[in-house]
Amino acid sequence: MEKVKIIGGGLAGSEAAWQLAKRKIPVEIYEMRPVVTTPVHKTEYLAELVCSNSFKSTELTNASGLLKEEMKKLDSLLLRVAEETRVPAGVALAVDRELFAKRVQEILLESPYVTVIREEVKKIPEEGIVIVATGPLTSSDFAEHLIEILDTDSLYFYDAVSPIIYADSINYEKVFSASRYGKGEEAYLNCPMTKEEYERFVEELVNAETVESHYPGEEKFFEGCLPIEVLARRGIDTLRYGPMKPVGLIDPKTGKEPYAVVQLRPENIQKTLYSMVGFQTRLKFQEQRRIFRMIPGLENAEFARYGVMHRNTYFYAPKFLKPTLQFIKNERVFFAGQLIGVEGYMESAAMGIVAGINAARLYKGKPLIILPPTTMIGALISYVTTKVPVKQFQPMNANWGILLPLERPVKDKKLRNRLLAERALRDLDDVIRRFAINV
């Protein structure tokens, strides 16, 4: 019996293996550890957590909570084990990291359909169904292979992501729409600053707390893309001659160029999300919230995701992936996890679930599933498979802004989120029933 090969035994690879094994399809998981190590892994367990031990909120009124509820409906192995190895963390789901990874590995190895092979894979196998889930620390040899089958410009080795803000938390009385020199559509929202506001802002940036790196030598990846706090330390005017330059932008309230400007760019067609242009940062999340709320118009800003800069291997998925997570150039190959441009433990694991389900369906000659963008998992897949300009593509986590909006707008945020969650679970139940996914 031909075996499905999974390259990478992290969160996505483990979930994919579970989905195949439970359907009695033989699987080989290729995990390079401990033969080839990484700077951050401490054990040889599958599904090892290398950063936080938290999987975020479990509440349905939180986007992370909805994502987990959808994963449960699709029989997530990781969430089942997370409940077994849970540690107190309020409404968040946090785990004993070593017990968690150990138990995931035990369950997979107990299956007669799972074999774990401890060796580095340097190329995608030429035959059979394959799921690639090599993660943010993809080995250099396999990364070279990815460059060959993708192209040099489509593979990235670090994240430099600006914060993303919910549109409905912006104070539109203080911002204005305009593109520089009036060229093209008024695509950007502009937050104007006075000299006093700008200088206070820069002072806070200079003295803010930053995140320490998990990865040795990580800073060398960022030489061509400096964090705004580093730019701020180079001189009081550096930012306003860089990402905060006001040239070509006229504030309609004054008829003049502001002293400095923070530009916000739409992140999606619905314009429910805006990113802060040029604001890649390594500030701690609480510092981002505090300091960026000093910007006029962002006093009550709610963040769909915070800015991050860290080591991360991912590719420009919209050019290469179908909504089934199949590789456009070779449909027997699936991709999953952080490699395709999702951000976060559960987001990566969810991609593994879908890749595993669809690999199983391909194996059995059944039609593959595409989850609707009204579901959180479907919306994440839609995000990483919908073409946008290459420079605008950046890893995304679960948030309400990527879901299709409700047919009728709802102003109350809690009610809106609850209605979005109810619709998502209803639509997912419909797909599960129609395709007999859990049978």
Swiss-Prot record:
Read off the Gene3D superfamilies from this record.
FAD/NAD(P)-binding domain
Return any one Pfam family short name: GIDA
Q: Which cysteines bridge via disulfide bonds?
A: none
In its keyword annotation, does this UniProt entry include Flavoprotein?
yes
EC number per UniProt: 2.1.1.74
> Where is it found, in Gene Ontology cellular component terms?
cytosol
Q: What does this protein do?
A: Catalyzes the folate-dependent formation of 5-methyl-uridine at position 54 (M-5-U54) in all tRNAs.
Name it: Methylenetetrahydrofolate--tRNA-(uracil-5-)-methyltransferase TrmFO
What organism does the UniProt record list as the source? Dictyoglomus thermophilum (strain ATCC 35947 / DSM 3960 / H-6-12)
Lineage, opening ranks: Bacteria, Pseudomonadati, Dictyoglomota, Dictyoglomia, Dictyoglomales
Q: Which gene encodes it?
A: trmFO
